[in-house]
Amino acid sequence: MSPKIIEQLAPKGVLRVAINLSNFLLVTDRSAGGNPAGVSPDMAAEVARRLGVGIEYVEYKTPGEIADDAGMDAWDIANIGAEPQRAEKIDFTRAYCEIQATYLVPPGSPLKSIEEVDRPCVRNGGCKTNT
């Protein structure tokens, strides 16, 4: 690994990884040592291994909190969804996967497909804790 890349990704000699604890698809449990466990921590550990540096998990309750700390020297890499507002402060890589999701509608709703939901004048929302 190039020393320049190591310096860019782990300038303090350890890879500080922001971990979004609210996404149960990416962080599923805790290791015996108490660290976050799951896809996101595993990917971060592999990045640290390839860089040849140690890892430090910086835990956050929401991805919004991670984004808020961008530029504050609190973390080196993170695994959160790319959004235009976040991209003003964060450089994103290509997506490594696509997470399948769906809509819930009340009984009797006339909305039967994504195309009917994803159009002007149709209001929809999400969980506030995932902002």
Could you describe each region identified by the protein language model?
Residues 96, 105-124:
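Flexible hinge/capping segments at coil-to-helix
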Residues 6, 39-40, 87-101:
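A structural signal for short loop-to-beta-strand junctions that line the ligand-binding cleft
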Residues 16, 102-104:
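Residues embedded in well-ordered beta-strands
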Residues 30-33, 70, 91-95, 118:
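Short, glycine/charged-enriched secondary-structure capping and boundary segments
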Residues 65-67, 88, 113:
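Short acidic active-site motifs
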Residues 1-81:
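Extracytoplasmic small-molecule ligand-binding "clamshell" domains
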Residues 14-21, 37, 115-131:
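Short loop->beta-strand "edge-of-pocket" segments that line small-molecule binding or catalytic clefts
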Residues 20-24, 82-85, 97, 106-109, ...:
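Solvent-exposed coil/turn segments that connect beta secondary-structure elements
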